């Protein structure tokens, strides 16, 4: 009786979903020579198979019981890995030996002659191509990045200048900055949105597939917010990348491009990054508040460097960020700051806005603070703008009572920062970009998600059109800085 097909099965665990044709995979059937029709041998075929797979986290699980084997990678998610199964059809053993046929579990088959098979010790040679023939080995860079196109600095500058002259900035391309936050804060292309995927938390969430760039704006609310601009070009840049195909998977640029491609977008990469763009188009770049102030007083680069810390971290230290005074009466912080009773009393804080759905109202039972909860999540589905006016009124109440107000979320990075930016836009003539810069200058770790940035853009448009009135008197204390 011939062995069951289930007795010769290879199960491969992949770290993320891929298509079988994306795999550099062939079965080593050199051992089949002893069982070829011309040899006259009827020795049974060994129930083993060798797989060459250029992917991490490979698990080889031959079935020995004749029934399908399950694979458990140890995590709690059913979608964290994709299982691909490759069988040899023992019922058609003679044909398989002659043609070297391998049938995949998804019902497709490809032929690979025995003399073209590769084994685990070979890194070069012929492999199965997506079309079923023999092609070239797959490179280390994912195929979806090989099709990424580039845009030259001069071409981007022309697009930006054209939109500026036509007074239609919303018609311009979406520009995404993938560099570390501190570098973005020093200098970036005008209008560029920073994607904070350089820190460990964001990088891990992106790599695990918990969030992606477009996941943040893929919901109905996010799409409505970015409908004007995300239907246009998306341009991504880092410091100095020239060829996106050479970017390694660990680089933020790679992560962002991969996410955009998965969502069906066709992003362009700025050739040479910011370094190349600034050489001829420095007038289209924005700098941090400190650098601008130094140039205004004629201090030059040496004065700017003297004002910056001697040891500047490459990424913001979110976990160790301290309570930040944005205005004399308005403080932006995180969960730990909301628990620090001594500091809150020392700063004369009497009002607290909790912009979360799950964190408790710390010290509520003591009756020392007036609390307001804005139940919001830091996600692509959250409409945060619906709470703007409610938050503004509560902040004004604290201001009129001569008390300080702490607004916080989990980390003081996205939700609470968005409301503070909106408050400054409401009570000054600041643009969204100026208010964003002002808050970032005080608290460098802030990074509202793209969904919230879209809501801020819409809020700015309503302020400019008079749909939402500004409140310019009395003038806010602490806003003497020219932004």
Curated annotation (Swiss-Prot):
Gene3D superfamilies registered for this protein in UniProt: Protein tyrosine phosphatase superfamily (3.90.190.10), Rhodanese-like domain (3.40.250.10)
EC main group: hydrolase
EC number(s) stated in the UniProt entry for this protein: 3.1.3.16, 3.1.3.48
BP GO terms, sorted: negative regulation of epithelial cell migration; negative regulation of epithelial cell proliferation; negative regulation of epithelium regeneration; negative regulation of ERK1 and ERK2 cascade; negative regulation of JNK cascade; negative regulation of oligodendrocyte differentiation; negative regulation of p38MAPK cascade; negative regulation of respiratory burst involved in inflammatory response
Pfam families linked: DSPc, Rhodanese
Location of the Rhodanese domain: 169-286
CDD domains xref list: DSP_DUSP10, DSP_MapKP
Every Tyrosine-protein phosphatase domain range: 322-465
GO cellular component, one term: nucleoplasm
Keyword Cytoplasm applies: yes
Localization terms from the record: Cytoplasm; Nucleus
Keyword entries, A-Z: Cytoplasm, Hydrolase, Nucleus, Protein phosphatase
GO MF annotation, one: protein tyrosine phosphatase activity
Top-rank lineage group of the source organism: Eukaryota
Spans annotated as Interaction with MAP kinases: 200-216
InterPro entries per UniProt: Dual-sp_phosphatase_cat-dom (IPR000340), MKP (IPR008343), Prot-tyrosine_phosphatase-like (IPR029021), Rhodanese-like_dom (IPR001763), Rhodanese-like_dom_sf (IPR036873), Tyr_Pase_AS (IPR016130), Tyr_Pase_dom (IPR000387), TYR_PHOSPHATASE_DUAL_dom (IPR020422)
Disulphides: none
Active site: 409
Bilayer-crossing regions: none
Family: Belongs to the protein-tyrosine phosphatase family. Non-receptor class dual specificity subfamily.
Summary of the function given for this chain in its UniProt record: Protein phosphatase involved in the inactivation of MAP kinases. Has a specificity for the MAPK11/MAPK12/MAPK13/MAPK14 subfamily. It preferably dephosphorylates p38.
Designated name of the protein: Dual specificity protein phosphatase 10
Source taxonomy: Eukaryota, Metazoa, Chordata, Craniata, Vertebrata
């Amino acid at each position: 009786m011939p062995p069951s097909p289930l007795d010769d099965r290879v199960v491969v665990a992949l770290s993320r979903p891929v298509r079988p044709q994306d795999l550099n995979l062939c079965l080593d059937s050199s051992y089949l020579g002893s069982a070829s029709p011309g040899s006259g041998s009827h020795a049974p075929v060994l129930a083993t198979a060798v797989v060459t797979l250029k992917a991490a986290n490979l698990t080889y699980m031959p079935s020995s019981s004749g029934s399908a084997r399950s694979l458990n990678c140890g995590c709690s998610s059913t979608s964290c890995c994709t299982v691909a199964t490759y069988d040899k059809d023992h019922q058609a053993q003679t044909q398989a030996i002659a043609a070297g046929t391998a049938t995949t579990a998804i019902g497709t088959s490809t032929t690979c002659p025995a003399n073209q098979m590769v084994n685990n010790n070979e890194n070069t040679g012929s492999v199965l191509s997506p079309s079923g023939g023999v092609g070239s080995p797959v490179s280390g860079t994912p195929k979806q990045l090989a099709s990424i196109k580039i845009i030259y600095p001069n071409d981007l500058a022309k697009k930006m200048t054209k939109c500026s002259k036509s007074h239609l900035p919303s018609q311009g391309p979406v520009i995404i900055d993938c560099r570390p936050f501190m570098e973005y804060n020093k200098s970036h292309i005008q209008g560029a949105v920073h994607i904070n995927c350089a820190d460990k938390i964001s990088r891990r969430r992106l790599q695990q597939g918990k969030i992606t760039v477009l996941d943040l704006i893929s919901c109905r609310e996010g799409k409505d917010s970015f409908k004007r601009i995300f239907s246009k070009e998306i341009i991504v840049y880092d410091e100095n990348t020239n060829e996106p195909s050479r970017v390694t998977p660990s680089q933020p640029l790679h992560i962002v491009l991969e996410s955009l491609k998965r969502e069906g977008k066709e992003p362009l990469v700025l050739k040479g990054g910011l370094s190349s763009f600034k050489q001829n188009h420095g007038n289209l770049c924005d700098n941090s508040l400190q650098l601008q102030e130094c140039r205004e007083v004629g201090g030059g680069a040496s004065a700017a460097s003297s004002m910056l810390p001697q040891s500047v971290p490459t990424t913001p230290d979110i976990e160790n960020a301290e309570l930040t005074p944005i205005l004399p009466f308005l403080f932006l912080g995180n969960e730990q700051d909301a628990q620090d009773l001594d500091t809150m009393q020392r700063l004369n804080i009497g009002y607290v806005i909790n912009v979360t759905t799950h964190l408790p109202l710390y010290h509520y039972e003591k009756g020392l603070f007036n609390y307001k909860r804005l139940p919001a999540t830091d996600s692509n589905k959250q409409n945060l703008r619906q709470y703007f006016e409610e938050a503004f009124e509560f902040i004004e109440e604290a201001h009129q009572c001569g008390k300080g107000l702490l607004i916080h979320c989990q980390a003081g990075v996205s939700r609470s920062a968005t409301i503070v930016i909106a408050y400054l836009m409401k009570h000054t003539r600041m643009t969204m970009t100026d208010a964003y810069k002002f808050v970032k200058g005080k608290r460098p770790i802030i990074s509202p998600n793209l969904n919230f940035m879209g809501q801020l853009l819409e809020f700015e448009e309503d302020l400019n059109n008079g749909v939402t009135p500004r409140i310019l008197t009395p003038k806010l204390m602490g806003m003497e800085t020219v932004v």
